Each structure stands twice: as C-alpha cells, then as structure tokens.
Amino acid sequence: MSIKHPIIVVTGSSGAGTTSVKRTFEQIFYREKVKAAFVEGDSFHRYDRYEMRELMAAEAAKGNKHFSHFSPETNRLDDLAQLFKDYGATGSGRFRHYVHDAGEAKLYNTEPGRFTDWEDLEQGTDILFYEGLHGAVVTDELNLAQHADLKIGVVPVINLEWIQKIHRDKATRGYTTEDVTDTIMRRMPDYVRYICPQFTETDINFQRVPTVDTSNPFVARWIPTPDESMVVIRFRDPHGIDFPYLLSMIHNSFMSRANSIVIPGNKQDLAMQLLLTPLIMKLMDRKRRAG
C-alpha cells in the first residue's frame, strides 16, 4: 500500500465482467481528472497463446487435465508483485501488453496471441489500475493483496459467470459450447484454490444474481440482462459507508446484512459511481497531502 502512489485492483474470473467495471473506473478517472496507468492481468501470463496450447497438450498427454491460466505456475506473479512494489515506492515499474486480437495487433504491431516487449510505465501517473485474475491473490510465496489500496471483486454467481463466458468465447473466439465447457472443467481446481479466496481479501465485492432460471448454463440461449438481475454489494469493512445515502439514491435498493446492500441490476453502474468516486478521491487527497 502506498500513500503517494496508490494502487487499485479489480479482480475476477474469466467471464465475470471485470472489463465492464474497468470502463466505469475510466469514466470516473476522466471526470475527476485522475491520470491512471492501466495494466491487464493477461500481460502477466507466463506463456503466450501458442506456447500455452502446446503445453496444455503435453500436460494432457501426461494425464494432467487441469493445466490452466488460473494457476500461479502459469503466470508471472513475481513480476506482478514487483510491479506493485515498484509503483508503490516510485510511481513506475515494468509492464507489457498481451495482444488479444487483430485490432490490438495493429495498435501494438505484434501478432495476436503474443506479448509486446517489456517497457516502463509512463511517469507522472496518479494511480495504478490493475484488472485481471490475480490482483488479490495470496499464496505461500506471494501476497499481492497487501500492495493494493483498494481491491474490488467482480463475482457473478457461478452459473451466470459460466453463461457469460460461454457466450463471450463463442462470439469473439469462435469456440463451441463444448470447447468452453472443457475449459471450465480444466480450470476448476485452480478456480477453487486461487480465484475464490481472493474475494475474502477484496474491500468491495459486486455479485450479480439473476432473477431468471440459469439452472443449466450450458444450454442458456441468452445472458440474463441487468433488468433480470440483482447485484449484491458486500463491504469488507462497512465503517464509514453511508448506507442511508446509498439507499436514498438507488431506487429499490435494500440492506440484506449489516455489510451488504442489494440493488437492481440496471443500477450497478450508478452504484459504482456513487461508491467508488469518493473512495478514489480519498486516495487522491491522501496523495496530495503527502506531497
């Protein structure tokens, strides 16, 4: 954690919706004139798309059916921890990009599925923003959660998460439902060991809960819409949270526990704006006072 160079992480599984949350942060940063450095968790994978395919096939041939990107072994978490440590101390650090598609390939002049070269973060940023799988992971060797000043978990109920992943991967990556199902099953042990425990470390969790039947996510024809959902917002430490204000500002919201508020799904962006803006500005105020 750092007063002069704060770090925000948004962590969630593949298909959880962390990219949408990132867009909300971008809106807040733009409105409040906060200059952020953005880092994606994909860029800290240990292997590129083609290396990973070969390794998965080799591991499967050995009988390992659970070789996945969710594991610390397939990610450069030591480099991510070093980035967090360096940024907290100096406001800089080394990062790279992972090139997802043809559009990014043109932007970074790198083949899709590959990494760009390592480079230094731009000087003079106010905040480091990380979005990915491992922002709050804690293992016997590493504690990434300790470096972040604000940790956000994006955690749809698991059937909804799977529906979102299946539809996204089919639409953008050309996968079949069977392909995505195999991926989900392969990742499950690492999901339980390394993804779920992070949501105990996060300061705020946003959990979307559908109000329609998602009993069999592998045959769902549509992703439940925000109007067909509620969102449970859970605070690790509810002290200082103005719940009466939130209840008055978000129509049809209610408290389900002393540290949790439930809102209509179509109010999630508004809730994030109301909740996160003061927290970000508090970090910026601390930064300014520290000189």
Swiss-Prot record:
**Transferase among the record's keywords?**
yes
Q: Give its E.C. classification number.
A: 2.7.1.19
Locate the residues binding ATP.
Answer: G12, S13, S14, G15, A16, G17, T18, T19, S20
Which top EC class is named for this enzyme in its record?
transferase
Record field: catalytic activity:
D-ribulose 5-phosphate + ATP = D-ribulose 1,5-bisphosphate + ADP + H(+)
Q: Which Pfam families does the UniProt entry name for this protein?
A: PRK (PF00485)
Recorded GO MF terms: ATP binding; phosphoribulokinase activity
Q: According to its UniProt record, which protein family does this protein belong to?
A: Belongs to the phosphoribulokinase family.
Q: Name the chain's protein.
A: Phosphoribulokinase
